[in-house]
Curated annotation (Swiss-Prot):
This is Glycerol-3-phosphate dehydrogenase [NAD(P)+]. It holds the Pfam family NAD_Gly3P_dh_N. The keyword Hydrolase does not apply. The gene is gpsA. The lineage of its organism: Bacteria, Pseudomonadati, Chlamydiota, Chlamydiia, Chlamydiales. The active site is at K192 (proton acceptor). Keywords: Cytoplasm, Lipid biosynthesis, Lipid metabolism, NAD, NADP, Nucleotide-binding, Oxidoreductase, Phospholipid biosynthesis, Phospholipid metabolism. It catalyses: sn-glycerol 3-phosphate + NAD(+) = dihydroxyacetone phosphate + NADH + H(+); sn-glycerol 3-phosphate + NADP(+) = dihydroxyacetone phosphate + NADPH + H(+).
Length: 334
């Protein structure tokens, strides 16, 4: 069965998945607030961030959300974590959620500490859980656009919703694996961005592959510990939503979070680094939320804490590195 899909958010990530869904035979209407972007997409049939990619005819665009929702059998969002609440609030004013809503963004809301899926449930109410889905995993947008092989996970509370979303996204090169631990999938995608900033700092100081692999491994330990205390399955974090996404983000040349960390090591301030990148660096905001939650629950997360202190307490990076290296070497899995 082919879907009629409203895709909310036409940044590079949103466009890459909208393009994938259209190439998979679905009718897709992409929505964005920016009328100039919508006009360019509609007239030139090229995305400014990917001008080499031709847009299929069954992918259209609008800056009016009600037009995107007309006849939709599925809604997919691809906005920033900060944009999640206002976009879903606008969506709630236009429709009650009676079709699958697939979250593809990764982050934790500032101030509230809510996962993006929890924001959706707060806005639409607990009964909406039956329609909620979450897609995550190692998936660099530019590679998805090129049709490179990619493996991700999709999670949902309702088995029928899970099957419908799985069927919509699955292609010969975009492998979609079901996972029933939605909260674990969401946390893995959010927390890995903080570890990626630490890996970028390591890159900036040219500490080498040994140091970076150590950060990834100990970072995964932090993520898994945090998620387990939050009620998630540890195995979820050992898979694509945890280890897989963490590896891609920390080692990819296209990772904003890793680049951000590298720029910090080169002497830029956080604000200067964000300006130079010119796009949202989710790990900056997740570091604050994760630190607040970890402090409340007394979860020891030394790498995450160090990144937080560098960003929000003006901790000298060299001092932060020294503090990490001076920690006791406990039994590895404790």
């Amino acid at each position: 069965m082919k879907e009629t899909i409203a895709y909310l958010g036409m940044g590079m990530w949103g466009f890459s998945l909208a393009n994938l869904l259209a190439n998979n035979g679905h009718r897709v209407v992409g929505w964005a607030r920016n009328p100039a972007l919508i006009e360019q997409l509609s007239v030139q049939r090229r995305h400014p961030a990917a001008p080499h990619i031709s847009i299929p005819q069954n992918l259209s665009f609008t800056s009016h959300m009600e037009e995107a929702l007309d006849g939709a059998t599925m809604i997919v969002e691809g906005v920033t974590s900060a944009g999640m609440r206002p976009v879903l609030t606008q969506l709630k004013a236009l429709t009650e959620l009676r079709v699958p809503l697939v979250i593809t963004s990764k982050g934790i809301e500032q101030n509230t500490g809510l996962l993006l899926s929890e924001i959706a449930l707060e806005i639409f109410g607990r009964p909406a859980a039956q329609h909620l889905g979450y897609l995550s995993g190692p998936s660099i947008a530019s590679e998805v656009l090129r049709g490179c092989p990619c493996s991700v996970v999709i999670s949902a509370y309702n088995p029928d919703t899970l099957k419908q979303i799985h069927r919509a996204f699955l292609t010969p090169t975009f492998r979609v694996y079901p996972n029933s631990d939605l909260k674990g999938v969401a946390l893995g995608g959010a927390l890995k961005n903080v570890i990626a900033i630490a890996c970028g700092i390591s890159d900036g100081f040219r500490f080498g592959d040994n140091a970076k692999s150590g950060l990834v491994t100990r970072g995964l330990h932090e993520i898994r510990k945090f998620a387990t205390i939050m009620g998630c399955r540890p195995d979820t974090l050992n898979g694509l939503a945890g280890l897989g996404d963490l590896c891609t983000t920390c080692f990819s040349a296209f990772s904003r979070n890793t680049l951000f960390g590298k720029l910090l090591a080169e002497g830029l301030t956080p604000e200067q680094a964000k300006t130079k990148i010119g796009m949202v660096v989710e790990g900056v905001y997740t570091a604050l939320s994760a630190h607040q939650i970890a402090t409340h629950h007394r979860i020891d997360m030394p790498i995450t804490t160090s990144v937080y202190r560098v960003l929000y307490e003006n901790l000298d990076i060299q001092e932060g590195i020294a503090q990490l290296l001076q920690r006791d070497t406990k039994e590895e899995y404790l």
